[in-house]
A protein has these predicted regions:
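Transmembrane helix-loop junctions in multipass membrane proteins, especially transporters and channels
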Residues: 25-33, 97-106, 158, 218, ...
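Membrane-embedded alpha-helical segments of transport systems
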Residues: 54-63, 71, 84-92, 131-140, ...
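Membrane-helix interface/capping residues of multi-pass secondary transporters
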Residues: 35, 76, 217-218, 226
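Helix-loop-helix module between adjacent transmembrane segments
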Residues: 20, 79-214, 275-281
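Alpha-helical transmembrane segments of multipass membrane proteins
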Residues: 12, 16-23, 60, 89, ...
Length: 281
């Protein structure tokens, strides 16, 4: 079942985990000095590091799946919507960030209290805490973690690596919960084996992230983000070059799209619409 993790992939994975853990430990003492050091890196973070960290955060596990899905259902034109993030971040950086820094606050909730004060501020903080902390973050984490599980499923085969009785105990647990966490869904004959394997993969991912975030604070997060964006950018470029090479070049790629979607793709989209940079054509 699934694919095998190559030696190079294993080295990259192990090296990054070791780096992330070491970054958390390295920045632990500095981050533990006070809240500003922990949450804001002492307000000394260079702009380029902050920018790369934001880019890495936007480029999550779900990003390739999302972009591919948008192109398949709405065409290249559908990607224009992502310009809103560029405009928003420029607005934040050049218009609002200065005022936030002068306010001397540490968190968004504190800014709300300083800006409004009194009972209205308390109500607003409560609403924002529930909406952003529970609804928005819950939805965001759900799709990112599910995307991570879909990507990890063919490669992280815990059922082949762990002792049988130990892994079976995890299978029994997820079976009792009854919530499938697999690409195939409930109809897959190995649904609970794959769900158990994906559950262990997510535990490992969350454990590493929680460790370096909790110990290193913002400095630890940014340091790992910079390495992540470098790996993702290089990997994406290498994958794109490989795909174009395999189909015979950019011209052949266009021909393959017309051949594959001659009678329409998802939702009836036509080849010309998939390749369109403007609505319709």
């Amino acid at each position: 079942r699934g694919a095998h993790v190559s030696f190079v992939d294993a080295i990259i994975l192990i090296a990054f985990i070791a780096y992330a853990v070491s970054v958390g430990l390295w920045n632990r003492q500095q981050a533990s000095k006070n809240l500003e050091e922990y949450f804001l890196a002492g307000r000394s973070l260079p702009g380029w590091k902050a920018g790369l960290s934001m880019a890495a955060t936007q480029f999550a596990a779900d990003t390739p799946l999302l972009v591919t899905g948008i192109i398949a259902t709405a065409g290249i034109f559908g990607l224009w919507q992502f310009w809103i993030f560029g405009i928003t971040f420029l607005l934040l950086g050049f218009v609002l960030a200065g005022a936030w820094r002068r306010a001397g606050v540490v968190t968004d909730a504190e800014l709300t209290e300083v800006r409004y004060g009194g009972t209205p501020a308390a109500v607003l903080r409560g609403v924002k805490a529930f909406y952003f902390g529970t609804v928005i973050n819950g939805i965001s984490l759900a799709w990112v973690l599910f995307a991570a599980a879909k990507i990890a499923e063919p490669f992280l085969l815990w059922d082949q690596w762990l002792p049988g009785p130990l892994f079976q105990s995890v299978v029994n647990m997820v079976d009792a919960v009854g919530v499938p966490l697999t690409v195939g869904g409930i109809g897959d004959p190995e649904v609970w084996v794959k769900t158990a394997s994906n559950f262990l993969s997510l535990l490992m991912i969350l454990g590493v992230v929680a460790f370096y975030s909790a110990t290193g604070g913002l400095r630890g997060v940014v340091a790992t983000d910079i390495v992540q964006i470098a790996i993702m950018a290089l990997g994406t470029f290498a994958f794109a070059v490989t795909v174009v090479w395999e189909v015979g070049g950019l011209g052949s790629m266009t021909e393959r799209i017309y051949e594959t979607f001659t009678f329409g793709g998802p939702g009836g989209i036509l080849p010309g619409e998939i390749l369109a940079f403007t609505p319709g054509h």
